[in-house]
Structures are given as structure tokens and as C-alpha cells.
A protein has these predicted regions:
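Beta-lactam-recognizing serine transpeptidase/beta-lactamase-like catalytic domain environment
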Residues: 1-173
Length: 173
């Protein structure tokens, strides 16, 4: 599917794709709880994406782009949540010894990233990865799930010269 995304990136242009990545939280550290912050990853600057090769690899999620599992999870949550991004958080509040909420952390920031119709199309596509595609091991016995598989090159090789790859899956139920 990389060739599809390379062509899509070329058609949409670097600025639109980069702006969407920013809106999804890529390149920005996530405040998870007081004193606990997730890594920001790396979002290539706009000037670098003027290079067609850089834009091509960025379009399918490689090159200078690095993201964290938390950022990918937040992106998938945005799709599952009808296009509304919700800043991830690990702590809802502080409780006393009796379990009574005594202090609440700030409310999660939310923002609309794309409209509900776009989210429905994306959910359907991601559901097909689980129902009939390579992600079928994630298919639940009841309900609907969706997901995205990925393979990231590391640029590292084992003693036999085989490239070491990172394989991942992110999804929703």
C-alpha cells in the first residue's frame, strides 16, 4: 500500500499531510499526568518535505517521521471516536484512603480532526483489516474491531545480513 500513499501524498501536498499529522498529535509531547510526559516523536519540518523522496516516505509513515505507540493509539481512538481527538491521559484524579475523589486532573483536551463521515469510512476500512485481512487474529467473537498493521524498517541487520524490522498492530473494539 506504500505506492498508494506516495501518490496520495503527492496529490495532497506536504503542507496538508503535515498539518493533519500535527492535528493528530504527532511531533508533540503528551502530558499524561502531572509530572509524566510522553515522548514527542519526530515530525519532519515543512522545508524537508519539499524534497519528493522525503514526502514519499513521510506519506507512508517512514523517513524522518517517528511516532510513539501512544500517538498511534490516540490516532486510532480519533477514528473510533467519530473524528474527535482526545488527548490521552493515565490519571483521572487523586483519591484518598477511602477511595473518594479529592482532586481531579485537568479535563482532556478534545478537538475535531475530521468529520464523522470520514471517520465512518476509515472505521469501515480498518474493520476490513480485522474481518478479512492480515489482522484477522484481532477479530473478537462478538462486536466489531478495526486495526492497522505496519512494518517499519530499522536500518539494522542481524549477523546473517537480514534486515531487522519492527512489526506492529494498533486497533480498536
Amino acid at each position: 500500500c506504500n505506492t498508494y500513499f506516495i501518490e496520495l501524498g503527492r496529490l495532497l501536498g506536504a503542507q496538508r499531510i503535515r498539518k493533519m499529522a500535527e492535528t493528530l498529535g504527532f511531533g508533540t509531547a503528551t502530558q499524561l499526568a502531572p509530572g509524566l510526559q510522553g515522548a514527542s516523536g519526530t515530525l519532519p519540518d515543512a522545508a524537508a518535505l519539499e524534497n519528493p523522496g522525503e514526502l514519499a516516505t513521510f506519506s507512508f509513515g517512514q523517513g524522518a517521521l517517528t511516532v510513539t505507540p501512544l500517538q498511534i493509539t490516540a490516532m486510532m481512538n480519533t477514528v473510533a471516536n467519530g473524528g474527535v481527538y482526545r488527548t490521552p491521559a493515565f490519571v483521572q484524579g487523586i483519591v484518598d484512603a477511602d477511595g473518594t475523589l479529592t482532586g481531579q486532573t485537568r479535563a482532556a483536551d478534545t478537538r475535531t480532526v475530521f468529520d464523522a463521515a470520514t471517520a465512518r469510512v476509515l472505521r469501515s476500512m480498518l474493520a476490513s483489516v480485522v474481518s478479512e485481512g492480515i489482522g484477522s487474529e484481532a477479530q473478537p467473537k462478538t462486536g466489531t474491531a478495526g486495526g492497522k498493521t505496519g512494518t517499519a524498517q530499522t536500518g539494522q541487520y542481524d549477523e546473517n545480513g537480514e534486515e531487522l524490522l519492527n512489526y506492529w498492530f494498533s486497533g480498536f473494539y
